Amino acid sequence: TINSRTINYHIGVNIEKLFDLLCEQILAGLCFSTSIEGKCNVCSDSKREEAARLAAKFISKLPAMRKILATDVEAAYNGDPAAESYGEVIFCYPAIKAISNYRIAHELLELGVPLIPRIITEMAHSETGIDIHPAAKIGTHFTIDHGTGVVIGATSIIGNNVKLYQGVTLGAKSFPLDADGKPIKGIPRHPILEDNVIVYSNATILGRITIGRDATVGGNIWVTENVPAGARIVQTKAKK
């Protein structure tokens, strides 16, 4: 039975189980990535030590991750009049599943864990229809309403208190190529959304542009230029 007297014991046991599982998965990622590069195909003791170190470091970040996820739940609850409780948001909202997977994957990626972060976000993508690359940088109180069809590219930067609706794409406008005609990796190519931005359904925002603080982007709009802070970008009204 879990109660106030036994909770610390249960947490300790589950953290130990988590550590073992993480070590196994991180080790698999490390071995896979080096075998692909042709360096080796054997998981050495040094890799096992590295996996254990990374797993321990990730676990140390769990309290901070929990705090930031709590802000995401709060944002979803406060932004949806249909939400009746925090519990409903946590268990029923696909965006929370996708954002949770992203937060976990992002921390693993920041630690240098190969492959596993992308697998984690793609699991959420398959389940929810929300595609968030683990390399994207996203602030607190982030929410996605409905969520289906949202795409957030690898070099996207999203501030605090940002809200996206279904079908929003934060994508690249073009891909610079090297001398062999292949895309150059790592170049910032996705949008920056500053604090308190709202982007409504099916808006497409492309390229390394900035959507300024407190701006609103209306639905079904294609945006490829900077949007000033506080601006409202909407479709031109049809003439009667």
Cite the ranges covered by each PLM segment.
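Terminal amphipathic alpha-helical/low-complexity segments used for targeting or macromolecular assembly
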Residues: 1-119
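Structural signal for interior beta-strand "rungs" in well-ordered beta-sheet cores
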Residues: 124-240
